[in-house]
Amino acid sequence: MLRFVIAAGLLAGTIPMPASAQQREAWQAPMLSITRYDEDWSDLADADKRAHHWTGPFKYIPLGDDSWLTTGVELRARSENYHDNLWGGADAPDDSYVWFRALPYADLHVGKVRAFVQPIVAYAVGVSPAASPIDQTRAELLQGFGEIDLGSVTLRAGRQMLSLGTERLVGTRYGPNVPLAFDGARADVTIGHAKISVLHMRPVQPGPGSFDDATSQDKALWGAYGTLPELDIYYLGYRNRLARFGGQVGREVRHSIGLRSHGVRGDWHWNVEGVTQFGHFEGQRIAAWTVGTEIGRSLPTLPTAPDATLRVNVVSGDSRAGDGKINTFNALFPKGKYFGELSPVGPTNIINVNPRVSGTLGGGVLFSLAAMAYWRHSVADGVYDIPGNLIRPPNGSTAQFIGKEAEATIAWQATPAWELSASFSAFGPGAFIQETGPAKTITMLGLESNFRF
């Protein structure tokens, strides 16, 4: 109860805010990003612009001719309070805990050379039955890389977070307490309006103690991600020596080819993405796919200036066990809260329909209301969580309906650097969950305070 009271006093949220809702400074500060390394503060070389806001002297510290230092920090406290988690089947179905994390960073520029360092201090209080390394990693190096700018080519090597497109396959895992980082190298090539990122990475495996994170020896990611205005096209290769499918553990090599169209026309906006996967796992052929659509319209002349959006996702599952083929889609390293603040199910073997409305109440307050419905794509396959772990096997059930969910969020941008938010979610079980195990309604209250500059 004490943890809940403390968290309530800290209120907060990770609700993404549209650009129009962000409070922009007089000197047109860049939008703060999750990764932080893609923010450009070089315009503050002008001392008059630095003087417009108290953060100016921190964002641009001149060190000499053509050299400067940018600094910043994120301080987040988040409480999550579950009742009947995993429909009552979790080890601790009624769990209430608080996450604390600090993410300071320093970004040094010397001519065409750059060094970026971001440590993390992350602790958890009250996680049952025990905090995992995603809840608590204590003190660690989250990001640390060197970079050289060769004009149209930028080369980078070291540890870094990755955010590709909408993070359908490669994301930062920002919602949980410990984000995901990768060790490796990356080259960004710019040709006119086109940009191509070529990368070879291994994910960082967090440990429960300080400075014990390690580069994964089992998983690897490589590929190329190209962007044009309103169009992304990419290839991603993936290897996992300890993959698990159908109770079998072995070596998985999977290739993903994706195409994404996105843009805005007047009051309308869209985001449509398709991915096909092929490869092999222990002598079995991989053939999987997904299609995700998002179409929305903003209505700025109505009260609250609402934006109505409909999202539909279809993600393949295995069609028949033992047939020599694996149709189960692998989302690789997806974003942390995939379908919403409460996301017990992940983007594998699923059909998801998600209408939502968001708007503004004035005074820096934003809200959103969402409904979700989930079905199994294939009745021969089960239900998975976001990392891709099987959480409910098919158990012979032919029911497709997994369940329905409702969610409400509210966020207040109290100052340009401080946001408070809250969310409440409820997930009612459908026929498949009712036929295969515990089937209680999950509820989750999330409270968050996030200060960053």
Where are these regions (language model features)?
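Surface-exposed loop and membrane-interface regions of Gram-negative outer-membrane beta-barrel proteins
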Residues: N81-F100, H109-S152, T166-T172, G209, ...
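Signature for the C-terminal beta-barrel architecture of outer-membrane proteins
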Residues: D149-L155, R168-G322, A380, R392-A408, ...
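Extracellular/periplasmic loop regions
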Residues: A26-A51, G246-G247, Q284-G396
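Predominantly the C-terminal beta-signal and adjacent terminal strand-loop region
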Residues: T415-E448, R452
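Transmembrane beta-strands of outer-membrane beta-barrel proteins
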Residues: T70-E80, F116-I120, R156-Q160, S197-M201, ...
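N-terminal periplasmic/intermembrane-space "pro-region" immediately following the signal or transit peptide
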Residues: M17-D95, T304-V312, R320, F453
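Structural signature of outer-membrane beta-barrel domains
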Residues: R78-Y82, A115, A122-G126, Q160-L164, ...
